[in-house]
From Swiss-Prot:
Designated name of the protein: Glucose-1-phosphate adenylyltransferase
PANTHER family, per the entry: GLUCOSE-1-PHOSPHATE ADENYLYLTRANSFERASE (PTHR43523:SF2), GLUCOSE-1-PHOSPHATE ADENYLYLTRANSFERASE-RELATED (PTHR43523)
Superkingdom of origin: Bacteria
Oligomeric and partner information: Homotetramer.
Function field: Involved in the biosynthesis of ADP-glucose, a building block required for the elongation reactions to produce glycogen. Catalyzes the reaction between ATP and alpha-D-glucose 1-phosphate (G1P) to produce pyrophosphate and ADP-Glc.
Keyword S-adenosyl-L-methionine carried by entry: no
UniProt-listed GO biological process terms: glycogen biosynthetic process
Family under the similarity heading: Belongs to the bacterial/plant glucose-1-phosphate adenylyltransferase family.
Amino acid sequence: MADQSSRYISNLTRDTYALILAGGKGSRLHELTTWRAKPALYFGGKFRIIDFPLSNCVNSGIRRIGVVTQYKSHSLIRHLVRGWGHFKKELGESVEILPASQRFSDSWYEGTADAVFQNIDIIRDELPKYVMILSGDHIYRMDYGDMLAKHKESGAKMTVSCMSVPLEEAAGAFGVMSVDENYRINGFEEKPANPTPLPNDPTRCLASMGNYVFDTEFLFEQLRVDSENMGSQRDFGKDIIPSIIADHPVYAYPFEQSGGDNAYWRDVGTIDSFWEANMEMVAPVPQLNLYDRKWPIWTYQEQLPPAKFVWEDHDRRGEAINSVVSGGCIISGSTLRSSICFSNVRVHSYGLIEDAVILPDVEIKRHCKLKRVIIDRGCVIPEGTTIGYDLEQDKARGFRVSEKGVVLVTREMLGQPVGGLSQAPNISITL
């Protein structure tokens, strides 16, 4: 029976085309998305956010994938070409990059539904029975095959993945739905200020994860109807879902119930949530297991030397405690505690780095103390700098301090030039 079930799901995934919406600005991340789209943002020591929905597709058996790009997409496209360009079309697999090309109108993508509509011919050429539309800006582990199976078994025309979240978290941030006892959706609001609570829990609501399954022809028809509606905002949550739930079978797919202990989803749309999700990775056994060989997270693998820790004097020791340190890093006579260092980070002597997310190609000079910080790519932290200990002083220096006291530092804030950095400087480990 298990073999039959696996074969059944594999047939469904082969008949599916996945479209990942990766054009979001991520404006709540402020300066972290000044030069990059949110899906291109770094996460977990070596990955980009876009790697997670792409890896979910591959691990679920979906190998026909389109990635819709728009906002500041250069670094995202470069990453996709370098890390995801190995698929072979002749074997029925591909990752296609779909920037706004204005083939159907003079406008850029005007909303999530319009982004799909403007690529309808590309989808049609693939002849899929089902189309999955996926969010490209969340960190999550999800077996799409199970969602496809539930979609087919329920007789749905559309299925929306959902999860229970606190009301205050959903307000103004997520689409919120109500369902009957069979999880058929009978109400939907996009980012309401006052979400409808669950009947059995007045403190929580059922929020959309932004992942959808459609029967292909039904999707095409709804996109055509929406394109002719001059009052539409061209958005699935604002327009299409509310317009179809009364007359068509649209079902919710409860993410937590199907994922079991392996279910993991994080919205990293703010500085605080981005920092918190990265900090989860330094736990001894994090909920998102990046070391699970049965569900690997794929990414571009830059060729780098191993991480190195040097000096063991009484007043300086290169060490990392409860931390993640990536290739190309040198921790020279400083202590790294409960932190993540992405590739090519150099930390010089006599420093203390705690609860920090250090993005690639950063250099931290001698005698620095950093705590609860995010250091953006390419920053050079001057000798003797202290950040995260006096938040008012940090604000006065031009750093961004989040609601929960996380300090974001970028090259612009340090008065350092932006652009032209392709690799970390060649720094002597004796410093």
